[in-house]
C-alpha cells in the first residue's frame, strides 16, 4: 500500500517520528526565518497528497506578494514579514494531542504580533496626519518614519524632528512605546531582508507599502497620539474600508472572521477545538477552525473565561461585532478599546484619587461654611448687644435732660407727675394691669431719676470745687514766683550800687580810672567827656534831683566844666541829700543814695 501511494516505509517512519517529537525537540526560530523555510521544504515532499503540515507550529513559506484567491481577486495584503492573512479555505490542521502545547507556545508570538500591529498603525497614523496638514509635511513625516525604522535616527531625534515638522508634540506614552516595540519591528525587517537577500534599507525601500499600508485597517485617531490636534477629542468614524467579493464565492459561506495580525507565521488555534476536523475519507478537512474564537483580546482577557457567565457575555459582544461584516467577507480590524488589568488598575487609582480630592474639597468647604456661620452668629450677637447698650444709654440721656429741664422750670414736680400719669394712662392695654402697679412703677422710676440727678449734681459740684482749688493754688504759686523775682532784682541792684561805692575813683560809664567829675552834682566821675555824654541819659535824673534840692542861689549857677580842680570846690557847694525812694535805687546803676546821704551828713 505504501508502494502504491509512492511513499516508502522508511519515509513513513521518518514522518511519524517527526510528527511525535517535532514540536517538543525543535528549537523555534524567529518568525519568518529562512531556517524554518528550509525545514518546511524538506519535511513536506512534493509528491504527498494534501496532508496537514508535519510541524503544527511550523511557519508558512515566506512570500511578499499578495496571495491570489480562487475567484481571481487579490485580497488580504501581507504584513511586514510577508505572511498573508489566509482565507478560511486553507487548513491549519492542528492535532488534538498537541493543541494545549501549541497554545502555550503561541502566546509570546501573539503578544509580539499585537505590539507590532499597534506600532504599524501608529506609524501609519503619523504619516496620514502629516498628509492631512500638507503634502510637504506628509513627505517629511514619511522620511522620518523610514529613517526611524532603518535606525538612522534615534527615537529622541525622531520626536524632536516630528514636533518641528508638525508643530504638535507627541503624547508622553509614545516614546516608551517606541522604545519597547521598535526593536521588534527592526528584527522582523532584518529577517525579511535576509530572506530576500537584501539589506534592510533596500527591502524597506521596495516594500514601503507593507509598513505604511493604509488599506489594512483604519488607523488610530491622531488625537490619541498627538496633543491638542482635535478640539472635541472624538474619534472620527473610519472611512477606509475594504471591499471584498466573498459573497460571490462558490464555497459555502462561513462565519465572518475578524482580521488577525499575520506578522508572525505561527497559526492560531482555538483552545475549544481539541479534535481536528476530518472528512469521511480520513483526511483532514481543509476548512480551519474559526479564527475569531481565540484572538488577541482573548489573551488579554483570559481571566474572564474562568467564570462561565462572563465568558458567554464576552462572546456575545464579540459575535455582535463580527456580525457587522459584509456578507461573510473579512471585516476591517476593529480597534480594541478594552483595557488590560494594569490599565484598569491605573484608571481605578486615578478615579479613587479624584474622588478623594473631591471629598477633601467638600470637607474643606463645609468647614469653611461652618466657620463663617459661627463668625456671623458671633458678630450678630455682638451687634445686638451694642444696640441694646446704645438704646439704654440714649434713654438714660433723654430722661436725664428731661428731669433737669423740669427741675429748673417752675411747677416741675406737678408737670412731671402729670406727664408721667398721662403717659401711663395713654398706654394701650392698661386695663389688663392694675393701677397700683403702674403707680409703684412710676414712683420707682421717679426715685431712680431723682437719685441719678442728685449724683450728677454732686459730681458737677465736686468737679467745680476741684477746679477752683487748682486755680487758687496756681495763682498763689504765680504770685510767689513774681515776688521772688522782684526780690532777686532788688538784691542785684543793691549789689551793683555797693560795687560803685567801693570804686568812687572809677568812671561810672566804662569803669576805668576817673579824672573828671560831673559839674552838676559833683558826685559822678568819668574818665572823659565821651563817657560823661554816654552816661548822661541815666545820670541826668540823679543830677536833676540834686539840683532841685539845692538852695535858690545855687539854682542859677551855670554848670562848670569838669576839671581837675573841681574837687576842691566841691566842699563849698555841698549838695543837699534828698530822700531817695526804692524805685530810684533800682532804676540804674548811676543812682548812689548811700554816697549822697554821706555827703549830706558831712555838709550838715
UniProtKB/Swiss-Prot annotation:
Residues 236-251 have a biased composition (Basic and acidic residues). Gene3D superfamilies: 6.10.140.2220, 6.10.250.230, TAFH/NHR1 domain. Residues 331-377 are annotated as: Nervy homology region 2 (NHR2). Residues 64-79, 88-105, 402-419 have a biased composition (Polar residues). Residues 113-208 form the TAFH domain. It is found in: Nucleus. Residues 451-491 form a coiled coil. SUPFAM superfamilies: HIT/MYND zinc finger-like, TAFH domain-like. Homooligomer. Homotetramerization is mediated by nervy homology region 2. Can interact with RUNX1T1/CBFA2T1 and CBFA2T3/MTG16; heterotetramerization between members of the CBFA2T family is proposed. Forms a heterooligomer with the AML1-MTG8/ETO fusion protein. Interacts with PRDM14. Interacts with RBPJ, GFI1, TCF4. Interacts with TAL1 and CBFA2T3/MTG16; the heteromer with CBFA2T3/MTG16 may function in repression of TAL1. One of its GO terms (cellular component) is nucleus. Its main location: nucleus. There is a cross-link at residues 38, 449 (Glycyl lysine isopeptide (Lys-Gly) (interchain with G-Cter in SUMO2)). A zinc finger (MYND-type) spans 507-543. This is Protein CBFA2T2. It comes from the Eukaryota. Zn(2+) 1 binds at residues 507, 510, 527, 531. GO terms for molecular function: transcription corepressor activity; zinc ion binding. GO terms for biological process: DNA-templated transcription; intestinal epithelial cell differentiation; negative regulation of DNA-templated transcription; negative regulation of neuron projection development; negative regulation of Notch signaling pathway; negative regulation of transcription by RNA polymerase II; positive regulation of neuron projection development. Zn(2+) 2 binds at residues 518, 521, 539, 543. Residues 583-598 have a biased composition (Low complexity). Transcriptional corepressor which facilitates transcriptional repression via its association with DNA-binding transcription factors and recruitment of other corepressors and histone-modifying enzymes. Via association with PRDM14 is involved in regulation of embryonic stem cell (ESC) pluripotency. Involved in primordial germ cell (PCG) formation. Stabilizes PRDM14 and OCT4 on chromatin in a homooligomerization-dependent manner. Can repress the expression of MMP7 in a ZBTB33-dependent manner. Residues 435-484 are annotated as: Nervy homology region 3 (NHR3). Transmembrane segments: none annotated. It comes from Homo sapiens.
Amino acid at each position: 500500500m505504501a508502494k502504491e501511494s509512492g511513499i516508502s516505509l522508511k519515509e513513513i517512519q521518518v514522518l511519524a517520528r517527526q510528527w511525535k517529537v517535532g514540536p517538543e525537540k525543535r528549537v523555534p526560530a524567529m518568525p519568518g526565518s529562512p531556517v524554518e523555510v528550509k525545514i518546511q521544504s524538506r519535511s513536506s515532499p512534493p509528491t504527498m497528497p494534501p496532508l496537514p503540515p508535519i510541524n503544527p507550529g511550523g511557519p508558512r513559506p515566506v512570500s511578499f506578494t499578495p496571495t491570489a484567491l480562487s475567484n481571481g481577486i487579490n485580497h488580504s495584503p501581507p504584513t511586514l514579514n510577508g505572511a498573508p492573512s489566509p482565507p478560511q479555505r486553507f487548513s491549519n490542521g492542528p492535532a488534538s494531542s498537541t493543541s494545549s502545547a501549541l497554545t502555550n507556545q503561541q502566546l509570546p508570538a501573539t503578544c509580539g504580533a499585537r505590539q507590532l500591529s499597534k506600532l504599524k498603525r501608529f506609524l501609519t497614523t503619523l504619516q496620514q496626519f502629516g498628509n492631512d496638514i500638507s503634502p510637504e509635511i506628509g513627505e517629511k513625516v514619511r522620511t522620518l518614519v523610514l529613517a526611524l525604522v532603518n535606525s538612522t535616527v534615534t527615537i529622541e531625534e525622531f520626536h524632536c524632528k516630528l514636533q518641528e515638522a508638525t508643530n504638535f508634540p507627541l503624547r508622553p506614552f509614545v516614546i516608551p512605546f517606541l522604545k519597547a516595540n521598535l526593536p521588534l519591528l527592526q528584527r522582523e525587517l532584518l529577517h525579511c531582508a535576509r530572506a530576500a537577500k537584501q539589506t534592510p534599507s533596500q527591502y524597506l525601500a521596495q516594500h514601503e507599502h507593507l509598513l505604511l499600508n493604509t488599506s489594512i485597517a483604519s488607523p488610530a485617531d491622531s488625537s490619541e497620539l498627538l496633543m491638542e490636534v482635535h478640539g472635541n477629542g472624538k474619534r472620527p468614524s473610519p472611512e477606509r474600508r475594504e471591499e471584498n467579493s466573498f459573497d460571490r464565492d462558490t464555497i459555502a459561506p462561513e462565519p465572518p472572521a475578524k482580521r488577525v495580525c499575520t506578522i508572525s507565521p505561527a497559526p492560531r488555534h482555538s483552545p475549544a477545538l481539541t479534535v481536528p476536523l476530518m472528512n469521511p475519507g480520513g483526511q483532514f478537512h481543509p476548512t480551519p477552525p474559526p479564527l475569531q474564537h481565540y484572538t488577541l483580546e482573548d489573551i488579554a482577557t483570559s481571566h474572564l473565561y474562568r467564570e462561565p457567565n462572563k465568558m458567554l457575555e464576552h462572546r456575545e459582544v464579540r459575535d455582535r461585532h463580527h456580525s457587522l461584516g459584509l456578507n461573510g467577507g473579512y471585516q476591517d480590524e476593529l480597534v480594541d478599546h478594552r483595557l488590560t488589568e494594569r490599565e484598569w488598575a491605573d484608571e481605578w487609582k486615578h478615579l479613587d484619587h479624584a474622588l478623594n480630592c473631591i471629598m477633601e474639597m467638600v470637607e474643606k468647604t463645609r468647614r469653611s461654611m461652618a466657620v463663617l456661620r459661627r463668625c456671623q452668629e458671633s458678630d450678630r450677637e455682638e451687634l445686638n448687644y451694642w444696640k441694646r447698650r446704645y438704646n439704654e444709654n440714649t434713654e438714660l440721656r433723654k430722661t436725664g435732660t428731661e428731669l433737669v429741664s423740669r427741675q429748673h422750670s417752675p411747677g416741675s414736680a406737678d408737670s412731671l407727675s402729670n406727664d408721667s400719669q398721662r403717659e401711663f394712662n395713654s398706654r394701650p392695654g392698661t386695663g389688663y394691669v392694675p393701677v397700683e402697679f403702674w403707680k409703684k412703677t412710676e414712683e420707682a422710676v421717679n426715685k431712680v431719676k431723682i437719685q441719678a440727678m442728685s449724683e450728677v449734681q454732686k459730681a458737677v459740684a465736686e468737679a467745680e470745687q476741684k477746679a477752683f482749688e487748682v486755680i487758687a493754688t496756681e495763682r498763689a504759686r504765680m504770685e510767689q514766683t513774681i515776688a521772688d523775682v522782684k526780690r532777686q532784682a532788688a538784691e542785684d541792684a543793691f549789689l551793683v550800687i555797693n560795687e560803685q561805692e567801693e570804686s568812687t575813683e572809677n568812671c561810672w560809664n566804662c569803669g576805668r580810672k576817673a579824672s573828671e567829675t560831673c559839674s552838676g552834682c559833683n558826685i559822678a566821675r568819668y574818665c572823659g567827656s565821651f563817657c560823661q555824654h554816654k552816661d548822661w541819659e541815666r545820670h541826668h535824673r540823679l543830677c536833676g534831683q540834686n539840683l532841685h534840692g539845692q538852695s535858690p542861689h545855687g539854682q542859677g549857677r551855670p554848670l562848670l566844666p569838669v576839671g581837675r580842680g573841681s574837687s576842691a570846690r566841691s566842699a563849698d557847694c555841698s549838695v543837699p541829700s534828698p530822700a531817695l525812694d526804692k524805685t530810684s535805687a533800682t532804676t540804674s546803676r548811676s543812682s548812689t543814695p548811700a554816697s549822697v546821704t554821706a555827703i549830706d551828713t558831712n555838709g550838715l
